[in-house]
Amino acid sequence: MRRRLPRRHAAPARSLLAAAHAALQSPESHRMDGAVLADPIMERLRRRYPMYHETAYLFILAALHFTIERLGEARHITGREMATGCRDLALERYGPMARSVLDYWGIRSTRDFGEIVFALVDLGILVKQEGDSLDDFDGIFCFAEAFEQNYPWACPRPIEQD
């Protein structure tokens, strides 16, 4: 998934950039780390996809940015890369509470990441390539393992005895 418009839409991209900048200044927008969705877009998401908290959509946009930065280049992101980026960002931000935070937003599996990505595609916020599918997000990892069993708990240091 990527946020860039194809070249043939270069002129509208400038107006989208201006609109995004204006939305940042607007009190009627929703934001998370630079990811912004204006109220009309968020309202459409709430109506069409009520199963996810509005913050989940912002988190997915932030995770897309996080994943692209980590890869070091702006390019198409696969479902697996996106799901892994979402996991890593959630662990980085929310630590041992990551699974609970995602659950509160309605995200309980990697497929939910895909559902949100494709909701954003449906509204024209993100674009997909021809071969992209919601199934690309199925079963990438188990939430219980990723957020609980394999959480990188810090091992306590042994007490030094005299």
Question: What kind of region is each of these model predictions?
Answer:
Residues 8, 12-32:
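Short, Lys/Arg-enriched N-terminal segments with co-localized hydrophobic residues
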Residues 31-162:
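Non-transmembrane, aqueous-exposed alpha-helical and coiled segments at domain scale
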